[in-house]
Design a protein with these regions (language model features):
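Short, well-ordered alpha-helical segments
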Residues: 4-38
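Short connector loops at helix/strand junctions that flank enzyme active sites
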Residues: 6, 37-40, 55-61
Length: 71
């Protein structure tokens, strides 16, 4: 097995429906511009509220790794 290096970035996904969809949105969007995604780990879950305290959006902060192809 050859040696590999992975880069780790943080992303925040949002959804008006759920934290699960917020996390999935972040990974799906990252997959459009990053190749070889490997692992996504949920770091933090929170909600965006309006002035009356009603939930406007669910937010998921993720740590995502992908294979580094630097020289």
């Amino acid at each position: 097995m050859s040696e590999s290096v992975y880069k780790v970035i943080e992303l925040v996904g949002t959804s008006s429906d759920s934290w699960e969809k917020a996390a999935a949105n972040a990974v799906e969007q990252a997959g459009k511009s990053l190749r070889d995604l490997r692992v996504a780990e949920v770091i933090k879950l929170d909600m965006q509220l309006d002035a009356k305290g009603k939930v406007e959006a669910f937010r998921a902060k993720l740590s995502v790794s992908f294979k580094f192809e630097g020289t």
